[in-house]
Amino acid sequence: MGDVKLVTSTRVSKTSLTLSPSVPAEAPAFTLPPRNIRVQLGATARFEGKVRGYPEPQITWYRNGHPLPEGDHYVVDHSIRGIFSLVIKGVQEGDSGKYTCEAANDGGVRQVTVELTVEGNSLKKYSLPSSAKTPGGRLSVPPVEHRPSIWGESPPKFATKPNRVVVREGQTGRFSCKITGRPQPQVTWTKGDIHLQQNERFNMFEKTGIQYLEIQNVQLADAGIYTCTVVNSAGKASVSAELTVQGPDKTDTHAQPLCMPPKPTTLATKAIENSDFKQATSNGIAKELKSTSTELMVETKDRLSAKKETFYTSREAKDGKQGQNQEANAVPLQESRGTKGPQVLQKTSSTITLQAVKAQPEPKAEPQTTFIRQAEDRKRTVQPLMTTTTQENPSLTGQVSPRSRETENRAGVRKSVKEEKREPLGIPPQFESRPQSLEASEGQEIKFKSKVSGKPKPDVEWFKEGVPIKTGEGIQIYEEDGTHCLWLKKACLGDSGSYSCAAFNPRGQTSTSWLLTVKRPKVEEVAPCFSSVLKGCTVSEGQDFVLQCYVGGVPVPEITWLLNEQPIQYAHSTFEAGVAKLTVQDALPEDDGIYTCLAENNAGRASCSAQVTVKEKKSSKKAEGTQAAKLNKTFAPIFLKGLTDLKVMDGSQVIMTVEVSANPCPEIIWLHNGKEIQETEDFHFEKKGNEYSLYIQEVFPEDTGKYTCEAWNELGETQTQATLTVQEPQDGIQPWFISKPRSVTAAAGQNVLISCAIAGDPFPTVHWFKDGQEITPGTGCEILQNEDIFTLILRNVQSRHAGQYEIQLRNQVGECSCQVSLMLRESSASRAEMLRDGRESASSGERRDGGNYGALTFGRTSGFKKSSSETRAAEEEQEDVRGVLKRRVETREHTEESLRQQEAEQLDFRDILGKKVSTKSFSEEDLKEIPAEQMDFRANLQRQVKPKTLSEEERKVHAPQQVDFRSVLAKKGTPKTPLPEKVPPPKPAVTDFRSVLGAKKKPPAENGSASTPAPNARAGSEAQNATPNSEAPAPKPVVKKEEKNDRKCEHGCAVVDGGIIGKKAENKPAASKPTPPPSKGTAPSFTEKLQDAKVADGEKLVLQCRISSDPPASVSWTLDSKAIKSSKSIVISQEGTLCSLTIEKVMPEDGGEYKCIAENAAGKAECACKVLVEDTSSTKAAKPAEKKTKKPKTTLPPVLSTESSEATVKKKPAPKTPPKAATPPQITQFPEDRKVRAGESVELFAKVVGTAPITCTWMKFRKQIQENEYIKIENAENSSKLTISSTKQEHCGCYTLVVENKLGSRQAQVNLTVVDKPDPPAGTPCASDIRSSSLTLSWYGSSYDGGSAVQSYTVEIWNSVDNKWTDLTTCRSTSFNVQDLQADREYKFRVRAANVYGISEPSQESEVVKVGEKQEEELKEEEAELSDDEGKETEVNYRTVTINTEQKVSDVYNIEERLGSGKFGQVFRLVEKKTGKVWAGKFFKAYSAKEKENIRDEISIMNCLHHPKLVQCVDAFEEKANIVMVLEMVSGGELFERIIDEDFELTERECIKYMRQISEGVEYIHKQGIVHLDLKPENIMCVNKTGTSIKLIDFGLARRLESAGSLKVLFGTPEFVAPEVINYEPIGYETDMWSIGVICYILVSGLSPFMGDNDNETLANVTSATWDFDDEAFDEISDDAKDFISNLLKKDMKSRLNCTQCLQHPWLQKDTKNMEAKKLSKDRMKKYMARRKWQKTGHAVRAIGRLSSMAMISGMSGRKASGSSPTSPINADKVENEDAFLEEVAEEKPHVKPYFTKTILDMEVVEGSAARFDCKIEGYPDPEVMWYKDDQPVKESRHFQIDYDEEGNCSLTISEVCGDDDAKYTCKAVNSLGEATCTAELLVETMGKEGEGEGEGEEDEEEEEE
């Protein structure tokens, strides 16, 4: 027989491993990498981190490549749990630099590099808004060394990993992954050990931050393992994925064999560092044999008669990790290309030795090689290698060509295959009839038949999921009358899947595929029913007692126990074999009361109750009489419930609760690491009775630490402590069960299999436990793995095997477990014994840490034998049941995408949610197994839906209703499932603190967010999953009592007997009684029926009826025969016998026939009513109390009134009266922006309201204002006043008032402008273009315009003859052509600036200049030097453009093809009708006055910019919402696109030419007092495709500096924007110089200095302003070029060169004619352009204030109260939507016509999601609002919902958007003074229409000016 042996080695040792369930080697991974740190000179530096891996990794620290010597200076520590540190004592200057930490073990090596910065005494200020928490945070800013570094290096990581790809031959395969790391990692793709090179078939590229490998026209030979390796200076990472290539009819080559569990294979492995395997390659891949990492050696002992052999390679388990029970499957060589090779280390090569032996060939078959696995009895035969087939299928045959044999020889393979070159005659196989896909029920007999023709007669094989099927138990394959049959005698669920049949003969082969779906038959549901009920009892204090009852139902009911209607905390409960039992040990007086057993399943609920009386011990003399005395007894505090350690994820909410008993009442304080916690917005304290809670709204890593609760009163004090660990999210997915294991009932001597399928990323480790003890494989017990399926096999089971089995899954993200029971049947056992055994194993069904917290809810298990000693042990474990329940928090980290994928895979939600079984018939055996199959769907819900923390108000609304959890799953686009006829009745809603912990706070997205908050999933779905001790407020469970007598249960049945048990007596069962059959009860009937109703549109509708039934009926509602589900607007509830349906705000579509349907096991009843909804448009005005929802008597002008009959007119609701409850602060009065003359005084007065105490703080530029001799602040209870007595220029700026109280904060801003005469023009006037009698004089604008625009400049002249200053001219621009100068005189010039407030002092004097012939000759020489290739630039007559409103653009120009598009609109080619000249037309859509004003400003700015290097505007037109700018045509394309052209040679000389021109153009812009603010590669255009002339375009973001005062902006392209913009600091001309520096850096190197993986990272890089020339790209670049860039990329804007200095810089002064022209590589530039092209799609210019990492700078301008808090501006949107309390101050409000402070924005949404337009309207009287869709009024409905609140926020929400909603939407606000409108477009992306985005023409912008 043949042996398979896989041999590998490492540098360290050679080993032979048996790949069994022993612990696998795991490469090291830094779970907490050390961070960069800064320390003071002489201080101690400490690098800390944590590493994991197996075996325990060894840590070594290196500096400059050398290991650090340990001693007094360097102290290295490494603990057993992976925590390590490096301490450097007494840090000196020489210690600064980079340190490398290396973690190594047998699994691999991982490195991370960190930097130590040693600072002198002047510590630099750490000011990084992108990385810091929100300003004014609740805790002090952590020390620098503990902050995550944003400028340091970080090792590469895979944010997403490539998945396995399955493609058909000839198709395109694509792997993708997302990587992070700094510096940007280098990416390489390999197949085996061969590096892939780019060619026409293999394309490696990066797109929007995602790395792709694309393989065109995939061949069978391309199959195999592909590895992506990423490397940077901080480390290295790699990940592999498999490409599987299918033949034409193949579906999957890696599926599981039918009903055949795999067995472990012993493999010996040898890992080597580098493969010596070499082959002739093309494209870096071996030409024929593609599995390059595997060498094959065949030792043939007995050759087969045909001298043919098949080569096999091993296939590893799904997760690709060594040692996880790998299995070597026999796969033909050709197929091995599509399978994973074993990955021992990152680089491995494997050797497989195969020894072929003689095998008995089957009749009518070719000779075969049999692959024997060690330790396996059954043999699997594999089809031999076919050498002469005409058509091949990779799963059946691998054709070996002479070329491949040549390759094999080179690879060292000994060959024993003789090729037979004969051409057989005959006919290839053909299917005459094929099997068809079918659906079958479980247990059904299935036959697939196929008829095949061919000559010679074809052989036929059957496959399931690509794996050959063999005859075995329950499977038969045979041929009958020429028809081939596959017979499955009894179908089971596991038989579902894809089947195929293949026929082959020497002439060829063919195959056909089909699907089999096996479904479980439905089982009839039966509501719970008590056959024997609870019986009351009386016990003495300290005794044990047991309550029990018998209950039946299908599916098996959930049992919940209540004491006095409250969930029981400490008792022990079981439910087995229909017996529900509650055991209370050591009864206490508080255990006295009414006990209720509540049984619930999908069909209904039932309950029964009994009274238990606990007699107190007579230890006190007169218990009753001394009760008052007891109350007065004083004692020191004691903790009844203390703190327990918690582990939570970053961003979770945490609640810590203690229970304290003390008299007198104790004082409580909370401490964090010994420091008292103050109550703030983030930390809340709460007291409920004896319970005290600390709420942390959102935890951060710095919240980790020891928390202490101290309680004291005058008699003493006590404390309790616990540790909170905040974990940062791990990449990946928590383990979960694809298919859970089932409980098994077996007879002694049988073999038992317990199987499950699992998933998780990284793939989880699996541990099996029996009764808490880990199982180790041994005699009679095996643990197998086949990919993701794990199986426990128990052979010849005996009574000792019975028990509780647990499967635990773990990975770095989390863990998951599942319990099943194994029970043995004993035929002699009586029913009574079975029940007794069940009671003895009371603890088996409980799993406290598995996810059931709170009201004790237990799984169901049938009874099994257990020895009395085991029983006692179990009881002893349960002894301390009153102790604190341990809390365990498990969170799952998911990307939205992975959640969607996971949900999409869950085709039948019932398989996941509770294994709800719906079958028609069931065998008795099947019914026994059902209880164990009930899964806890709540765990799955928790995984899928992020629970929402409910307000008290919402709890009241939602608590009694049953939420259909299927609607939750359907939310994200899974197929909607029709509502079943039976809706489960309500369940008690008990809040679960875990859902609070798991709730991530997400501010609601505005204006088009498709994310709808998850409905109240907990109210129904998680009701049983909650704890009475939960740290969230828990409303009482709704349990309706209707008993009239304590001794009767809810249904009037007799009460069961309970037992009194001696203190330590053994639990003895009550006398067993035969269980009577469950009674059917009475059918439902309506005691009160529904009444017809007539209701006005917008009013509230309540329908009610009463139902009588026994058992209680399940109730459902329909409208016009369509099922109704509870939703935000429709509330369905059931309280006892009363059922109601409530619609808060009725819409016209709510009219129709409503039916209430009640159903139980005994029957069904229904009643109906009609509801008529009246349209109120024709009725009288609404009542004042309902202003918000009804149309009031309108004050609209006649135009709007006529429209209002078809449209919804919304009136602003009246401000609310002050609520009695506490309210957050509000700013009710605030000053407008102010402008004052210098020296005048100014008062800023604000009124505030809210719950006292309120603190008012005035801030300027994020710093608190301190009082001084000029500034005074007066704060009163409800007002605040800031007074500046004598204003100066430095008092200009934005003043922010922040008001705060315990409930929140508000802020508002006002801009103060101090006006004066301008400053003198900056710098020195400059003379240029000096001729014989003329020159051009130019100058800079004023550095400060005095708060009013500079209107003109006065030029003064001095000459050497007159020797005095005289006025020469007055002009508006910053240049003037001076004429009529005389050659014999010297001249000087100076300039003054004038605004409305006066004329400035004169500027500096110019240099002395003379005019004459010499200068003119030099000018001619310079002109002659212009290079020929530039040619003459197109002459454009400079024009001052005024917008033409009389004509259309088409009257003057012919509009031709479109040249591009962007957010502004589109660009078309225009031809002037008169002259035939070609121009570019930029067509804008401008709906609002603001948009039109912006475009007019752009035209106005371009009128000032007449320069050869700037594109010119020659005409402009305006017609309604369209504005057209006619621009000079620049046809050469973008500069960077020109550079990467094949015919363009890039040298440093070209770079100098381009940078000169850019500097000249920008210099002129600056001289006009203008900043461009959007300099980037896309805005630098080539004049033509041959020369090197360029022009700057796009002045849409340009601003006048001289008229803006201290100008701040919040827009720009992150990659090119300057730090001062991000920090929201005043900008200047230097802001453009930074952008020029970035462009120059990219131009010379092809690398971007600041680009990160996303905008936030890019902005963080810019803010830190750290960059370097370390890359090899700069090796060829001159020092002058580097110096030029260095002088531009300076964080301090004052230190940057200006344009004039740039032009005088040595680099730009170089002689480009004679300088050496060294060719620069364009590869990096090509990559940069490819990445940029993807990145800029749709968002080239971003409003930086909207980026979350820039949250600190948002809300810094704008007048009104923004609703954002200074500590958390990111929540502004959320706070703004709160119902705010505003005091009405009518007498102070002037009448104002409506205007929008926030307009609606264009948006794009996917079909089926929701869209929302938001705006904010101001005006007085309060405006009324109407919405229009394409100029048609919108009527409010379920589809269109309009909200308008008292703050003026108005929104239009469109639910379930469809293609028809793609339109232009307008919001119109009207009052008696006038109207205002704003318009936006909704673009609906229908599915399957991706990739339609056009290129962005010249501009793509989004501007936010506040």
Swiss-Prot record:
Annotated region 5 X repeats, motif IIB: the residues are 693-1866
Tell me what PTMs the record reports for this protein: The C-terminus is deglutamylated, leading to the formation of Myosin light chain kinase, smooth muscle, deglutamylated form. The C-terminus is variable, with one to five C-terminal glutamyl residues being removed producing five forms differring in their number of C-terminal glutamyl residues. Acetylated.
Record's compositionally biased regions (Acidic residues): 1415-1432, 1893-1906
Identify the tissues in which this protein is expressed: Isoform telokin is expressed in gizzard, heart, lung, intestine, and skeletal muscle although the levels of the expression in the latter were much less than that in the gizzard.
What segment(s) does the record annotate as region Motif IA?
Answer: 1317-1364
* Binding annotation for ATP: L1459, G1460, S1461, G1462, K1463, F1464, G1465, Q1466, V1467, K1482
The Swiss-Prot or TrEMBL record lists the needed cofactor(s) as:
Mg(2+); Ca(2+)
Domain (Fibronectin type-III): residue spans on this chain: 1321-1414
Localization per Swiss-Prot or TrEMBL = Cytoplasm, Cytosol; Membrane
All copies of domain Ig-like C2-type, residue ranges = 28-117, 156-244, 429-517, 521-613, 637-725, 735-830, 1084-1172, 1225-1313, 1794-1885
- Which SMART domains does this chain map to? FN3, IG, IGc2, S_TKc
Q: Where is this region: Motif IB?
A: 1385-1402
Q: Where is this region: Disordered?
A: 127-157, 309-453, 831-881, 947-1086, 1180-1227, 1414-1433, 1885-1906
> One Pfam annotation, family name?
Pkinase
Q: Where is this region: 4 X repeats, motif III?
A: 970-1226
Q: Which residues form the Protein kinase domain?
A: 1453-1708
IIA- repeats (start-end) = 660-676, 758-774, 1107-1123, 1817-1833
Substituting S1768A results in:
Decreases membrane translocation
Ranges of Polar residues composition bias in the record: 345-354, 384-402
Basic and acidic residues: compositionally biased ranges: 309-321, 403-424, 833-850, 867-881, 1039-1051
Its GO CC terms are:
cleavage furrow; cytoplasm; cytosol; lamellipodium; stress fiber
Skewed-composition ranges (Pro residues): 977-988
EC number(s)? 2.7.11.18
Q: Which reaction does it catalyse?
A: L-seryl-[myosin light chain] + ATP = O-phospho-L-seryl-[myosin light chain] + ADP + H(+); L-threonyl-[myosin light chain] + ATP = O-phospho-L-threonyl-[myosin light chain] + ADP + H(+)
Family the UniProt entry places it in: Belongs to the protein kinase superfamily. CAMK Ser/Thr protein kinase family.
Q: What is this protein called?
A: Myosin light chain kinase, smooth muscle
UniProt organism field: Gallus gallus
